[in-house]
Curated annotation (Swiss-Prot):
Residue numbers annotated as active site: 119, 252, 282
Pathway stated in the Swiss-Prot or TrEMBL entry: Lipid metabolism; fatty acid biosynthesis
Top-level enzyme category: transferase
Protein name: Beta-ketoacyl-[acyl-carrier-protein] synthase III
Domain of life where this protein originates: Bacteria
EC numbers on record: 2.3.1.180
Reactions this protein catalyses: malonyl-[ACP] + acetyl-CoA + H(+) = 3-oxobutanoyl-[ACP] + CO2 + CoA
Species, as recorded: Paracidovorax citrulli (strain AAC00-1)
Matches recorded under CDD domains: KAS_III
GO cellular component, one term: cytoplasm
Domain notes per entry: The last Arg residue of the ACP-binding site is essential for the weak association between ACP/AcpP and FabH.
InterPro entries per UniProt: ACP_syn_III_C, ACP_syn_III_N, FabH, Thiolase-like
The protein's assembly and partners: Homodimer.
Function: Catalyzes the condensation reaction of fatty acid synthesis by the addition to an acyl acceptor of two carbons from malonyl-ACP. Catalyzes the first condensation reaction which initiates fatty acid synthesis and may therefore play a role in governing the total rate of fatty acid production. Possesses both acetoacetyl-ACP synthase and acetyl transacylase activities. Its substrate specificity determines the biosynthesis of branched-chain and/or straight-chain of fatty acids.
Amino acid sequence: MSRYSRITGTGSSLPPRRLTNADLVAELAGRGVETSDQWIVERTGIRARHFAERDVCSSDLGLEAARQALDAAGVQPADIDLIIVATSTPDMVFPSTACILQNKLGANGCPAFDVQAVCSGFIYALTVADSMIRSGAARRALVVGSEVFSRLLDFNDRTTCVLFGDGAGAVVLEASETPGILASDLHADGRHVGILCVPGNVYGGQILGDPLLKMDGQAVFKLAVGVLDKAARAVLDKAGLKESDVDWLIPHQANIRIMQGTAKKLGLPMDRVVVTVDQHGNTSAASIPLALDHAVRSGQARPGQNLLLEGVGGGFTWGAVLLTL
């Protein structure tokens, strides 16, 4: 009996509308909000991001990413027996975006559900899928991270609205007799709910509280670098590997400073870090699978290499997955 899981296909999707920093600066100026390309690049490393149109939902972006991943794995939607979608921007309050995506794919009948851990969501979802495959509850899972985060942005707050973008990434995770997912490590600390949140909710058809993103950037940075280092070392420990055994670090693409800080703590040079934040911005739960698909399709990440995926997000949540491609 297979006791392991392995990624057999990856995919990604970005909305056609691409905004460079210059584009966004011009739009914000119309609102009386001042910023500049230099200010954004120096603080975040971001040069462009993609925004979805009003009629495009997370399931739409996830569908394209899923189809690419299925094609890369050489499997049909009917072959999938588990669908997990990581998102903080679901199509509806309910049902889950996973169920909506399942219907669009034509993969009806298998378990389908969402995971909500914000920017750590894909790490959580991949870990859950791996656990279900190891237990025998599934053999071939579709794991998707998809976001239309632009819907949550306060475009009067230059410190946050320049950071985020929309997109989706997906993987097919299959049962295997040889290890693919080597180790995972998940954590959360609800004491830090307020440093990164969208505090609004719906009651009686009305929005209560603030429906837009709020973030204490300094607090997030201080927490993120420390916890990501611990999670990375935890999965290396569990797998019996060292930092030097990591071929590629694929971190959540939050901003270049957090990524540089994490790599430095692990003793990894930036030329072994997959970086897409410059072109995609922070796409929350989509950022890691987007970066993974980019690394695979560009030839950076190759079969047999060890990849360290790690993410941190609102909640406060964080985690890491170590895998052999």
